Amino acid sequence: FERKNFSDGLVPQRKFIHIGTTSTNNEPRIPLHNLMTTRPSVDIFPEDQYEPNAAATLSRVPCTVCGRSFNSKRGLGVHMRSRHPDELDEERRRVDIKARWSDEEKWMMARKEVELTANGCKHINKQLAVYFANRSVEAIKKLRQRGDYKEKIEQIRGQSALAPEVANLTIRRRPSRSEQDHQVTTSETTPITPFEQSNREILRTLRGYSPVECHSKWRAQELQTIIDRAHLEGKETTLQCLSLYLLGIFPAQGVRHTLTRPPRRPRNRRESRRQQYAVVQRNWDKHKGRCIKSLLNGTDESVMPSQEIMVPYWREVMTQPSPSSCSGEVIQMDHSLERVWSAITEQDLRASRVSLSSSPGPDGITPKSAREVPSGIMLRIMNLILWCGNLPHSIRLARTVFIPKTVTAKRPQDFRPISVPSVLVRQLNAILATRLNSSINWDPRQRGFLPTDGCADNATIVDLVLRHSHKHFRSCYIANLDVSKAFDSLSHASIYDTLRAYGAPKGFVDYVQNTYEGGGTSLNGDGWSSEEFVPARGVKQGDPLSPILFNLVMDRLLRTLPSEIGAKVGNAITNAAAFADDLVLFAETRMGLQVLLDKTLDFLSIVGLKLNADKCFTVGIKGQPKQKCTVLEAQSFYVGSSEIPSLKRTDEWKYLGINFTATGRVRCNPAEDIGPKLQRLTKAPLKPQQRLFALRTVLIPQLYHKLALGSVAIGVLRKTDKLIRYYVRRWLNLPLDVPIAFVHAPPKSGGLGIPSLRWVAPMLRLRRLSNIKWPHLTQNEVASSFLEAEKQRARDRLLAEQNELLSRPAIEKYWANKLYLSVDGSGLREGGHYGPQHGWVSQPTRLLTGKEYMDGIRLRINALPTKSRTTRGRHELERQCRAGCDAPETTNHIMQKCYRSHGRRVARHNCVVNRIKRGLEERGCVVIVEPSLQCESGLNKPDLVALRQNHIDVIDTQIVTDGHSMDDAHQRKINRYDRPDIRTELRRRFEAAGDIEFHSATLNWRGIWSGQSVKRLIAKGLLSKYDSHIISVQVMRGSLGCFKQFMYLSGFSRDWT
């Protein structure tokens, strides 16, 4: 190679012709080797600004947005993409002069042409040009001449000929009871309808039940009389009798409103802290989850408005008139829904029990009292209600309570109304909802309230559509819609009409109509209750049947959307993703998205719902394949006359709890979410064990959804784990060199059980991706390859030392092995053989104070401040025992050998013996403590001899060091007493002819049981699991007593911690 010299110190530049960022030419990037210059182009730098000694400065490319300069256009492009993506979109955007026809536009124009032709319009080209304003008449004319377009016309006409006629399904006025009585029908002239047949089957089932043998308070004979006379008395009279019967077995109690006396004003800070601690502990005892969430969310500043404000507002919302009719196509189902309205079985009752923690309705029937009803009685009650097609008057009324949507809720609209009907109504509606849900062929685009991971399905679909559009430079237009008060505004007429359209049984439709038109509610607030009224619209949030009814209406909406409009993903088209009222629309063109918006708005207005245009937004991605890029363009979309906001590339938005931008999922930082909550948990008046419980069961699981479906880097997960471990060490006062594995290993293996997000997050993502079900994208190669790539990436993140941690047990085993390999955690190796002994670590029981729990954890991990522990790594310092023993001062030495702690060791041993003795006496055994057995081998004194049913059980207790196998120590103890001379002496002394068995209660000084020892004692009925847990705590306390005694006698009278 030849070196060339250039004057004035200038560096030669190689010129390129660029595409994509600034050049509008379509030529490829070609290096021009012959164009070697020594000064910049005149077009870029004027001559009067050029100086020979400033060539290095003049060769840099400046950024027009922030003024920063770069050495090359490539560097400027990287800078623009990372720092100014919105400005880069403006720079890249090009105007289409002769854009290609997309498949979506062809379908829309073909459908419009069929519509215009059917209406007898002439001059079709000019008419179509009005609707397709961005196309010229000549372009429309040429497209209509193409063969593929003509095929679409024929296909649409064929579909129109085969499609059923659209029927106006108007809700007619129901005939009154007198009008129904005057209608004369005879079985000879009128065929039996399915409704009558199902009623006969239900009544036949009621009569076929065998007599119930139960307590007299359930009045089985009175209920049987109601059933026997039902066909004679009629449904109204039967309902009245059933209502009186329910009042008899469930006396009206109502809901108690307890008024708490406000605490007196504290005199000082100490008394204020004590009052706060008392309030938190009282709430903790009532409901741990609610107490923890209230502490994590910070100060609840929500204030419910007064009754004078809440009642008029919500009464107006619930009683506003809604549309009385709904028009649409009748949905053709593959199978009948008659099973929904059939006799209830005992299996249905067991599967639909109301949770014991659920609140009672206005009738005062609690879930516990409902479960006490014999199944035979409950079956008769439920099936009688089915036969009558209506609820008894005593359980029709519901109460409506309000829960704040945010911690700053102060206006009536900031609260969510929750309906609380009777427990019996909830159980019956849960059965009907389960039957209806399993009988409907749901549209695959609706994933809410279904037995599937709908959040994962829809969030991943949105991510797939966005990333696929950018990867293949395809246009995509997305609209995220917000339905205003969807559950509170749905028209009742649309519910009845939709049920009929889906082929629901007449009895079920009548039941729903009767419960909505005849069931009232009262609004309940802070110490007040309004008068009863009947809502005219909306579904009852809190009722098990309401989500299914709402889903049916939204499912009907999805079926009305044009199938040819949507974002193309491989060989499939998807145009919507719905999760209850959270609706996202996709289209390939701007006009297509506007058509979907118009269709959605028309349907929602019919069913009484409205879109909140201010909370809706659109994302417009324009593909530019020639430039090999996509740009975000702000297009105008309308909901009625209101324009929807359009987002830019950098704008973030949330869908189903996951943050997105126009390019896909946004990288999240869980440390930012969990940091403030960890601080609140630190300041909260809780014990250390309560803080750990809150962290393990509530705070960390709150991150799982975002970590599993969002985007997060491994480094961020490690930093979050580090932050969590910092607070754990702070709460427990642990030294910094405590093994990391001790924090993350499960309690059953000896650790604290704090989940490690570094491993749990990829595992959860892999699990949720594996459970994704896309029925409409099953055969789609693009969707399948996208899912497989995401799952493989999650698997790669779960690779640890040639092992794949694909499940939670694998992760727990990984941390347990790392704990046992550490010096301080090796003594916990045998802790995994028996789980209940670790209950005090994972559950915040009242057995231990906060101080005792902290000391117990330090004892467990060998973190007590002995000389060997505090001088670790500094061998030149003195490490001998302070009591003068010829041994290093280790925790094991103090607990097991040092003479200063001998008295406490004896007390620790006796405490275990006394606990076992008490449990044996409670089981009816005769227990002798330390009997003296004079045998040939000498004097033997086992700790306990238990006599039961002419059998003898000998139990000896030992607390051993943790350096050896405890199972071997257990077996040595048994062999110590299981000898012929001792057996002979036992039979002679206690005159027992039965079997003689020898056992040991073997633990180490950390409170860990020998697996063989504790399992044998429990299997023989000599020890309960609860007692084994208590003994483990007592051993731990006794070991702490040994250490305190040693430190006290060593001159440490102050607190050694």
From Swiss-Prot:
Example of a GO biological process term: proteolysis
Coiled coil regions, renumbered to chain: none
Domain of life: Eukaryota
Residue spans, zinc finger C2H2-type: 61-84
Keywords: Aspartyl protease, Endonuclease, Hydrolase, Metal-binding, Nuclease, Nucleotidyltransferase, Protease, RNA-directed DNA polymerase, Transferase, Transposable element, Zinc, Zinc-finger
E.C. number: 3.4.23.-, 2.7.7.49
Xref: Gene3D superfamilies: 3.30.70.270
Annotated Polar residues bias: 183-195
SUPFAM superfamilies cross-referenced by the UniProt entry: DNA/RNA polymerases (SSF56672)
Protein name, per record: Retrovirus-related Pol polyprotein from type-2 retrotransposable element R2DM
Organism taxonomic ancestry: Eukaryota, Metazoa, Ecdysozoa, Arthropoda, Hexapoda
